[in-house]
Design a protein with these regions (language model features):
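Arg/Lys-rich amphipathic alpha helix in sigma70-family domain 2
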Residues: 32, 53-60, 70-90, 108, ...
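Short, charged helix-capping/linker segments at alpha-helix termini
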Residues: 6-17, 27-46, 146, 151, ...
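Internal acidic/polar
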Residues: 78, 86-108, 112, 139
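Structural recognition of an alpha-helix C-terminal capping motif at a helix-to-coil junction
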Residues: 42-49, 62-74, 156
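Short amphipathic alpha-helical boundary/capping segments
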Residues: 2-6, 114-122
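Residues within the DNA-recognition helix of helix-turn-helix
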Residues: 22, 157-162
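A short pre-motif secondary-structure segment
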Residues: 129-133
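Short, Lys/Arg-enriched C-terminal cap helix and immediately downstream tail that follows
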Residues: 81, 122, 127, 162-175
């Protein structure tokens, strides 16, 4: 019996193994959406707490990571409604850098600001697909499994999201 089925049956050790296996993926998703370590850690903890409570409702035919991402989308949305992020996307990029020079830092921060603003104008599902496809580097098939949408729908949403990003970034660059 696989870990998710055992965890759904109340096996705490199986759930702990699932936690260890998927912690980083859930944290990265939360960080990409919220942009601060503290908020991502808080949301990640809440996701696993809700997952533990919801395990009796888990449907084993669906990938466990899709179950977690569904919970994560709701927890992130709740968090964003409750408060605004305290640190900016630019701060996150600056902390992730390898200490570039001031000119490069300024250019990266400006690019990050523009990209963050453009992504923020996308619909929530477009944001998720951009995160999963390009930041998490997941295949279209994996994104379809995670979102519960057909691959053709994922490709269409991705195409519209990228067109919107190109338009937004192109129009900002022309100002």
């Amino acid at each position: 019996m696989d870990l998710a089925r055992r965890a759904a049956g109340g096996d705490r050790r199986a759930f702990a193994a699932l936690y260890d296996r998927h912690l980083d993926a859930v944290y990265r998703y939360a960080f990409y959406r919220l942009h601060t370590d503290a908020e991502a850690e808080d949301v990640t903890g809440e996701v696993f707490h809700r997952a533990l409570v919801a395990m009796p409702k888990y449907e084993p035919r669906r990938p466990f990571l899709a179950f977690l991402y569904g919970i994560a989308r709701h927890v992130v949305a709740d968090h964003l409604r409750e408060q605004r992020p305290s640190a900016s996307f630019e701060d996150a990029i600056a902390h992730a850098s390898d200490a570039p020079g001031p000119e490069e830092t300024a250019a990266r921060l400006d690019d990050a600001r523009r990209l963050r603003a453009a992504i923020a104008r996308l619909t929530p599902i477009q944001q998720d697909i951009v995160i999963f496809r390009f930041l998490e580097e997941r295949s279209t098939k994996e994104v379809a499994q995670l979102t519960g949408k057909p691959e053709s729908t994922i490709r269409g949403i991705q195409m519209r999201a990228l067109a919107a990003l190109r338009a937004a970034l192109g129009s900002e660059g022309e100002r």
